A protein has these predicted regions:
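Catalytic cores and adjacent flexible loops of soluble metabolic enzymes
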Residues: 1-204
Length: 204
């Protein structure tokens, strides 16, 4: 079943990441041709799992939800030779807005100088479920984790923070536009800015 899903994702040109729990989980997925793995925050101080993870040649996402700075530092140090992305989150379903603490993204970037991602578990039926990921883009995250379900009204497994397919497509489009809007830090003027200067700039 895993191999079929991986092959299907490759046909669609979608990267295939796996969320693992425990040593056996990461040992099992190491035999698969996947694009990356996420280590759950409950395993961030699992020395056997982390030692095994050092052998992986794929990107590793580290969930930092509910972890202290020293725990994150331990995992980052252990996996210092791996390609790491730190994932900020609050491990609650659904996450209350007051618990999001998005500014911690900036603290993680400053402390570890690594790419940062955001795992968003805000209630799927809240308008903020579309806004929080965009705030993450504004804070410089490079990966967004968002759950999807075929029909949230059926209240199946993991429906709390999941989006319906049409909502998910809309969010992807909004994320792409937000990334475009972020632009560059350069002060080099673009075509439209130059045109504005020609038409409206006043000189003494």
């Amino acid at each position: 079943e895993w191999k079929e899903l991986i092959q299907f994702s490759k046909k669609l040109k979608i990267k295939f990441y796996v969320d693992v729990f425990g040593l056996k989980g990461i040992q099992d997925i190491s035999k698969l041709k996947i694009d990356g793995v996420k280590i759950h925050s409950t395993d961030l101080n699992n020395p056997k799992l982390l030692k095994f993870a050092t052998k992986l040649k794929i990107p590793i996402l580290l969930s930092t939800a509910g972890c202290t700075l020293s725990e994150i530092d331990y995992a980052v140090t252990t996996l210092s030779k791996n390609e790491l992305i730190l994932m900020h989150s609050f491990q609650g379903y659904p996450t209350e807005i007051k618990d999001l603490n998005l500014k911690r993204i900036l603290a993680l970037k400053e402390k570890f100088a690594l790419p940062i991602g955001l795992m968003d578990h805000v209630s799927g039926d809240s308008k903020l479920s579309m806004i929080v990921p965009l705030l993450g883009i504004g804070l410089g995250v490079e990966i967004i984790e968002k759950h999807i379900t075929l029909d949230r009204s059926k209240k199946g497994l993991d429906y709390f923070s999941a989006l319906n397919p049409n909502e998910f497509l809309l969010l992807v489009a909004l994320i792409k536009k937000s990334q475009l809007a972020m632009g560059k830090q350069s002060f080099e003027l673009g075509k439209n800015e130059l045109q504005y200067r020609i038409l409206h700039k006043k000189n003494a």
